[in-house]
Each structure stands twice: as structure tokens, then as C-alpha cells.
Amino acid sequence: MQDDVYLTVEEIAKQLRVSPDTVRRWIREGRLPALDLIGQYRIRREDYERFLEQRRKGQTD
């Protein structure tokens, strides 16, 4: 678990070209797993990559 890499909401928003509020909404909706560190979310890279794969599958289905 110590080897896990974590991303911020802002980093993900920038990569996906969406607003940080959109990323937070995905987290609240349970679509993107995240740790809540007293109001600041951290997303494991592994969970983010899984989220991206699910989005890709959803776009092609």
C-alpha cells in the first residue's frame, strides 16, 4: 500500500480537461473511488486507470 501513487482532483481534472467540480461529483456519485483526507480527495492511480477504462468501454458500447 505504501507503493500506491495518489493523484489530486486538480491533476485528474487537468488530464481529462474537465473542472475539478466534475471530478468531485464523480467521487460523490461513487464513480471514482477516492480517499477523503479532511475535505481533500486523493485518488489512487490504479483506481483512476480503472475509471478511465470503464469510461472507454461506456463510450464504445
Predicted segments — roles?
Residues 16-41:
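Major-groove DNA-recognition helix of helix-turn-helix-type DNA-binding domains
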